[in-house]
A protein has these predicted regions:
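PLP-dependent amino-acid enzyme catalytic core
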Residues: 1-173
């Protein structure tokens, strides 16, 4: 497990801006007024896939060896991570297989397909989809892209924090 300083270095050197944009940090005026506190929102809904998940997926995939990208990647997700992996694969020119639960909303399935990924529907839960993704990864020699709990995914997603620090010179609680 990387140390905190290792993660900081990984965040500072993350490759996310080929697909992600630096999003604004905006005050939520109404919410701030109601709570009598300054509430800021990091507008990750402005990302190409409307979520911060693109950051982790792309950072992980951009760091894969060329041979791994040539074989392709696989992920299990019902939504935002799936779209992040699909867009990352599209940009990196590799095959992406996304295993989604059969209960996934059609709008999410279509969004993943529109990014060029192959969608496999399996089971009724994330765990069912994950188990099947791991089977396919082993069978087809695909690299599994975790939605979390991977140092490169964490570092990519951690760029949100780096931007917040850069965007706010004053103390943030």
């Amino acid at each position: 497990r990387p140390s905190y300083s290792d993660y900081l270095i990984r965040i500072l050197t993350a490759s996310v801006y080929d697909v992600a944009v630096e999003t604004p940090l905006e005050q939520a005026r109404s919410l701030s007024g109601r709570l009598k506190n300054n509430i800021l929102l990091k507008r990750e809904d402005l990302q190409p896939v409307f979520s911060f998940k693109i950051r982790g997926a792309y950072n992980k995939m951009a760091k894969l060896p060329k041979e791994s990208l040539a074989r392709g990647v696989i992920a299990a997700s019902a939504g935002n991570h799936a779209q992040g992996v699909a867009l990352s694969a599209q940009r990196l020119g590799c095959r992406a297989v996304i295993v989604m639960p059969e209960t996934s909303p059609q709008i999410k399935i279509d969004a993943v397909k529109n990014r060029g990924a192959e969608v496999v529907l399996k089971g009724v839960s994330y765990n069912d989809a994950y188990d099947h993704a791991m089977e396919l990864a082993a069978k087809d020699n695909l690299t599994y892209i975790a939605p979390f709990d991977d140092p490169d995914v964490i570092a990519g997603q951690g760029t949100v924090g780096m931007e917040i620090v850069r965007q706010r010179a004053d103390k943030i609680n």
